[in-house]
Amino acid sequence: MSIETGYRLTDNSRQLRRLFDERVRDLGLTGPQARLLLSLERYPNENQVFYAERLEIEPITLTRIVDRLDEAGWIERQSDPADRRARILHLTDKSRGIVTRLRASVEALFEDMLGGFDSAEREIFARMLERIADNLLAARQPEVAHG
């Protein structure tokens, strides 16, 4: 496999993020706000540190995003019983509608991305992505272990 494949994968990832950001803008959200809302739906009841790591952003950046979404009434912060300094994030009832529309927008984006792929190709592609994720995690393990 050539380095060209790696470049193509990186370029596709960048294009996907750009399209995602454009589509969620139509819902009145920034890309980071939308990613946080989707993460809150997928991984509920975690603290802000978890979401900052998941979204690969600095905690202070996440705090700004959380502040805006909290002001809009879409999320709420609660004290973490295990750590009084930490805050657990939750979606609010008000956010359910926007999250549903957001998920539909993302699903449409993925359909556009996979246009022309039949169901067998989509299944193979999904398995390949899982293997890539496993390989990347394994490659990172020595880094994590040795700091």
Regions from the PLM with identified roles:
Residues 1-27, 93, 143-147:
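N-terminal leader segment of winged-helix/HTH proteins
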Residues 8, 15, 19, 35-38, ...:
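Pre-recognition alpha-helix immediately N-terminal to the DNA-recognition helix
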Residues 52:
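The alpha-helix within a helix-turn-helix
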Residues 3-7, 27-38, 63:
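Short alpha-helical elements of helix-turn-helix
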Residues 17, 45, 49, 67-130, ...:
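Charged, amphipathic alpha-helical coiled-coil/dimerization segments
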Residues 40-43, 57, 132:
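Short helix-capping/turn signature of helix-turn-helix
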Residues 60:
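Key DNA-contact positions within bacterial/archaeal DNA-binding proteins
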